[in-house]
Amino acid sequence: YDSYSIRQETVPVHSSAIKARGKWIPVIWPQDGRQADKGSGKNLTEQYKKEGVNMCPEWFTNPPQKGLREGTGGNSVEAGIMEMLVRMQTKRLKVFKNQNKLLEELRMHHRKDGKIVPMNDDLISALRYCIMSLRKARLKIYEPLQQLTDSEFNVFAR
């Protein structure tokens, strides 16, 4: 599909790029999205909402364990990376070859002393959030473009 990743840009610029991909698309955000922006003093989530971005009502968490309530799943990176790996191995996650930036991040992704090195992994993190939030995914229902049959349609009707 598509990806977007630009550093050091303003909220209005990011908002415009996000909305251009579909205003209805829900945006998943990390817990630190509630932190105040250094420039304005307002939290980033509220700034994006004000710009018309469809922000999810709550911050990202991994799926909860069976029987526990939503929001208790934590935000373990390891769980998300392993889910991505399993999905790739079972052909349930495919990355298009036009996703150069993501493919580069995947090539550079590595561990040191058994721990994931969090460096230049913005798109990997976004993909991890997406995969771990699939439980909340919904299809967009489109309204029919024309509600009248051809025989009922009257170009001169008011």
Language-model segment annotations:
Residues C130-R138:
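Short, hydrophobic alpha-helical segments
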Residues Y1-P118, A137-I141, Q147, V155-R158:
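Mg2+-dependent endonuclease catalytic cores in nucleic-acid-processing enzymes, primarily RNase H-like
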